[in-house]
Amino acid sequence: EVWVLRDKRQPIYGVEEGISIRAIKREYARLSGDTRRLTPKEIFEIAEGNLEGNPAAAREAFDHAGEVLGEAIASMNAVVDGIVVIGGGIIAAHKYLMPAVMRELNGTLEMYEGTPADRMEMKAFFLDDPGDCAAFLTPTSRRIVVPGTTETVEYDPMKRMGVITT
């Protein structure tokens, strides 16, 4: 049950408060001052310029949700190594959501002394993107010696995680 992970942007709340339908609606209203009772689909249409409203605020609302989602996925990935499938109605807005998700997954943390460290031990690739998918599938292998022998084997040191939407 990942909903109990913390919301990166508002740590007193669970992650569900930052990535749900109500989160998109609340964040758009806060950013735009728009008091209409809009659905995430309508907020997406505003972001696209197909509906009256504040497109920048609409895109930012999805970006904020993507940041929270990316942090939640990165936290889960620290424990569970696997492919990530993101579904649900909100994923229809993936063009505004996924850039922030990927920024979080491939972002950095800072150590107390100021040294940056990768957020995850692996590189995340957005498999819906042809370029990322090709990079994900391209090995970066080299030959290494098997300890205690003279044998060599092919080894790919790059840890990878694929992220795909449904």
Functional labels for PLM-detected ranges:
Residues 6-166:
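ATP-binding/phosphotransfer module of carbohydrate and carboxylate kinases, centering on a glycine-rich
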Residues 1-2:
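A conserved active-site-flanking secondary-structure segment within enzyme catalytic domains
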